[in-house]
Amino acid sequence: MVSVRKRKMARSSVKKNTRRRKDKQRDINIHSNPIIAKNWDKSLTLKQNYKRLGLRSKLGNIAGGVEQKVETLTEIRNKRRAKLELLLLLQSVSIEEIEETEDPSRIPIGEARIIRDPETNEVLRVIYGTMKVDGDDNDNVSDAAEETEEREGQGANSVIKELEEYAAKHAKVRKERHMSDRESEWAKALYEKYGDDYERMKWDKKLNVYQQSAGDLKRRITKWKKANNIQ
């Protein structure tokens, strides 16, 4: 026997918002810019896409928390292995040598070799490394990490460069607005009566019918003087 609530839900015109329907919201087509459309990742959100492309989704200051980058276990292991390989390369030691050696002085500090029983796979012995890593080596590792981050940022920089070139190529030339004959006569009448005294000019009820401010009148008179070569 179905409950009353379930029967009402079945008759309702509002369908349940399932994950299958929700994911369709991300499947959008970018029509505004071909470069952004080409580099858009539909599996990411708008904010994540903008950050990956080196752009900002909002021009204002950040209010609230910032989404932290969560690394997967595979990424952490790969990063740790790459760091270890670089350290071993600087110490002239290979990973294969560490996997075979029982000398703690040939294993870096923070690493260990686990020796297991080949039949039962039980841990028989754990050899902890005692090989110290020099400060210069740590600096080299940090430099290598910075170089990796720079390489990752080059993709975003190339997109920004493409966008700048596209904007410069498709920028519209702004046409300067010219004053009409009637507007020129009006500016001339104001200038002949008040000169450069824009504060008195704005209180003239007959000439300044629309009560334009002193700053607006100054811009218009300056433009009229420039068009008529008046200093």
Curated annotation (Swiss-Prot):
UniProt keyword list: Nucleus, Ribonucleoprotein, Ribosome biogenesis, rRNA processing
Superkingdom: Eukaryota
Bias-annotated ranges (Basic residues): 1-23
Recorded coiled-coil stretches: none
Subunit structure: Component of the pre-66S ribosomal particle.
Organism: Lodderomyces elongisporus (strain ATCC 11503 / CBS 2605 / JCM 1781 / NBRC 1676 / NRRL YB-4239) (Yeast)
Name of the molecule in the record: Nucleolar protein 16
One GO term describing the cellular component: nucleolus
